Amino acid sequence: MKVLLLEDVKNLGKAGEVCEVKDGYGNNFLIANQKAKLATNEVINKYKAEVKKKAEKEALEKAQKLQMVETLQTITLTIHKKVGANGSLFGAITKEEITERLKEQHASLNLDKKDIELKHPIKSTGIYEIEVKLGSGIAGVFKIDVVAE
């Protein structure tokens, strides 16, 4: 019996491969545990279409992330904070505050606080470079300008 593997099976093959197996093994183990489907033309074509659709979706998401990084690199985010006598801020600037200000000033950019990498807390005025990691090996840098109110 021929089956289409839905996931990697040790000593048999990888997901997406069509393998010849004994009827009992195919029906009682692979198909019963949803590790494979009976390899008909319809099932194979449907699987290939799903794989193609998934690849197109991933390519689109990657393109959107690259576009977001390009846009981020051109902006400077301004944050106004209260400052003490010695020039230090009352409290530090957090990832959450950066994402909120980014949404206020640039509504088209939708970053999550987990995407922002702060190496150390921002506790004084000045211009800082903030690293952004969007997954899939896509990273970028944008600047924030912390100004006294």
From Swiss-Prot:
Pfam families (UniProt xref): Ribosomal_L9_C (PF03948), Ribosomal_L9_N (PF01281)
Biological process (GO), any one: translation
Keyword rRNA-binding in record: yes
InterPro entries: Ribosomal_bL9, Ribosomal_bL9/RNase_H1_N, Ribosomal_bL9_bac/chp, Ribosomal_bL9_C, Ribosomal_bL9_C_sf, Ribosomal_bL9_N, Ribosomal_bL9_N_sf
Entry keyword annotation includes Ribosomal protein: yes
Keywords: Ribonucleoprotein, Ribosomal protein, RNA-binding, rRNA-binding
GO cellular component: ribonucleoprotein complex; ribosome
Any GO molecular function: rRNA binding
Function: Binds to the 23S rRNA.
Membership in a protein family: Belongs to the bacterial ribosomal protein bL9 family.
Name of the molecule in the record: Large ribosomal subunit protein bL9
Gene that encodes the chain: rplI
